[in-house]
């Protein structure tokens, strides 16, 4: 028998009401002050000008000259869940990121984006990818890679975070979802839930640890989807009746703009409905998720579906998948789930390889531009100093000559 959420999902699908529901949530969301993010000294710590933490829920760095970081503490008391939702670190904020992880006693970092997506840099490389440790002298931390477990669509790193001043070390789990497209949704609820339950099984989300740090690029779309699904499943485990819209509105009191598109909202419903099967005691469901996710295949890279760009919000586009909405969407939730999980493997792999090549090329181009800019700066500095140094050299020759002549003159007079 369909649950209340399943009936609500079917109704929203049948009436094509995802966009209106999403707009309702946006319009009913409260806006709170975020003045600190706009201080002149903090502007270069924000990845996007219009995604800022609220003053009342922002994470404050302790014992720092400037306590600002673009991160929000989302505290859902009834679920006994706390998350730190943050942007993808910038090159100048990686040190603050690790300081926050240390001070908040975080056990895991959940990363839901790639470094480069659609030829745009979405996040700095803030963790080591080889045996060489990374030093963050500004805040006094080093990070070392202990192990790496690479799956087809996610990777788990085990990192050692060391406080250089005290010598104390902590082990941090880094869960990296590598195929979730920006403004999009994962390939299937099965793959997403398989990943979510891997994070859960590590104990990193439990209340006896500091809050898990969850980020994508802006820290609101994919991060909001992850947090919403996990929170709703926890509430269902406790036997509570849940209203997904109300839960999301409550979470939006802590960080602006959580869930960026109607597609992400629809996917959240699908993942919650599918995840509820495990909560209700279906012991085989997690095994089925793992099989459907094909996590043991060779890693592949994400491909984003074609989008219809409809409007802008928080500096980001709201896109709906280009699909012909027909009566087939009303054929039942199970078939929708199954259809979402299927794809053409060969075609997908080719697209993913092309996307990876583009990303690699974009990264190389950016590095080349940085080198050219540095060379240009050096050239301009040299052009500025060259005439000054030439004049100084000329004056030095005159002074030395005058000194020598003066010395010889006095020597002759002395004789």
UniProtKB/Swiss-Prot annotation:
It holds the Pfam family Y_phosphatase. The modification Phosphoserine is found at residues 52, 293, 298, 304. Changing residue 380 to Q: Prevents location to the nucleus; isoform 2. Residues 376-415 are annotated as: Mediates interaction with STX17. It comes from Homo sapiens (Human). InterPro entries: NR_tyrosine_phosphatase, Prot-tyrosine_phosphatase-like, PTP_cat, Ptpn1/Ptpn2, Tyr_Pase_AS, Tyr_Pase_cat, Tyr_Pase_dom. This is Tyrosine-protein phosphatase non-receptor type 2. PROSITE patterns: TYR_PHOSPHATASE_1, TYR_PHOSPHATASE_2, TYR_PHOSPHATASE_PTP. Induction: Up-regulated by IL4/interleukin-4 (at protein level). It comes from the Eukaryota. GO terms for biological process: B cell differentiation; erythrocyte differentiation; glucose homeostasis; insulin receptor recycling; insulin receptor signaling pathway; negative regulation of cell population proliferation; negative regulation of chemotaxis; negative regulation of epidermal growth factor receptor signaling pathway. Residues 346-415 are annotated as: Endoplasmic reticulum location.
